[in-house]
Amino acid sequence: MIKLLKKIDIEFYLILFLLSGMFKNLLFSIYGNNIKIPLTIIFGILLILMIYIKDIYKLKRLKEEYKSFIFLLLFFVWSLFSISYSSSENYVWYKLLGLGTNFLAFFGVLIMKEISLKRFTIYFSYFTYFFSLIFFMINPNSISKNFIFHDYFNEIYIQGWYLVLGQFLIVNMLLIFSFSEKKKIIYNLLISLNIICLLGGRFPIVLALLVFFIISIYLIQKKYLNKKLLMQFFKSLTIIILINSVLNLSSKTYRSLLLRSVYRFEVLSSSFNDLNFLNDQENYQESLNQENNSFNKRLEYLLFSKTKIFENKSSLILGYGLGSFSNEYDQTDRRLYPHNIIVEMVFELGLIGLLLALAFLISNSSSYKGFFTNLALLAALTLLINSMKSSSIVDLRLLFALLAISIFHFNKLTLQN
């Protein structure tokens, strides 16, 4: 058994750990939330064990590179200290454990002798496409509320996947440039962009289009584009369009996904007034109201945070303590956050917590050389941007792993491929 496990790439175990939350949500949707399997902890322990068993650790890097993570450790120590004045009694410990998994992702990558970004990307792509397929099959956010597999899956546990998968696919759009085959890069780039549009996350769609535009400009400036490459791109694009056309004609689920992507932008624009193309006005209006409520709720969280943060000097400098947001907001002790990690850090850990986080990023600025060729760093940046709108600081395992790869394992992989 051990011999079999040793043959599996360490990047596979790392991906299992980083995406453990997705596996957990999928299990909940099948068996309900009564199932008590701590997948993140199990996969985290498995990752560390395989690093040891495969003998691919380099512990002396902890001593050699301590300046790269000293502020990250101080951030964790400050988070621990803030528990002493946090109003949360129960959730705070879950949040502390979540922070711990972020640091495990960072230090797990740090102590590895080497990591292949290409193998990492292959496994990451496979799993991301797999979860996207599951999401499309179940279609948990269907406007018609007609859930095909309702007898087998409880769709409520994966309704938020459209945002998470959107973030992951943007990461994939950048990491695939670690491949050497141009055809594979183009197809994966277009497939990722296509899936993001079908998922319907507004911000991921906008950011994905921006990333695609920047990649195009970069390739043009560096004169990497040639006639052969353009022919391959348009050939691949034609195939993707044909597949989408067939699905649009033959699949009701596909049309439902496409429709949802269109109407979600109505929340941000008043120009979408012609709704005659919709067959189910009542369900559409109900879904639209839910989208408006979601948008308004996030705005309410931000305004509430602003008021509380500047309430006094103590709240600004020290914050209200780790895991305290829900207690301060509605006197409940549960998972709740303002959907912006900077606001979340200042609210719970004060300016001290924010400055420690910034110090960690700034202290590694020398490792960010070759910015446009450091694919892991670019991918981490997109996750950081996304986290300003829809993440909590305990949900950033992938971000921390990519930062560690960009700092300790950057080997000048370029977009020239």
Model features per residue range: what roles?
Residues M1-I10, K182-K183, S367-F372, L403-N417:
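A juxtamembrane structural motif centered on a specific transmembrane helix
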Residues M1-K54, V77-S86, N139, L383:
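N-terminal signal-anchor transmembrane segment
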Residues I45-I48, A376-N386, I393-N417:
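Transmembrane alpha-helices of multi-pass inner-membrane enzymes
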Residues K67-F76, S88-M112, Y123, F130, ...:
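Aromatic-anchored transmembrane helix interface
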Residues K118-N146, Y157-K222, S245, L381:
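Alpha-helical transmembrane segments of multi-pass inner-membrane proteins
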Residues Y126, Y218-L229, E348-L384:
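Hydrophobic transmembrane alpha-helices and their immediate junctions
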Residues M137-N139, L198, L219-N289, T307-E311:
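A membrane-periplasm/extracellular boundary helix in multi-pass inner-membrane enzymes
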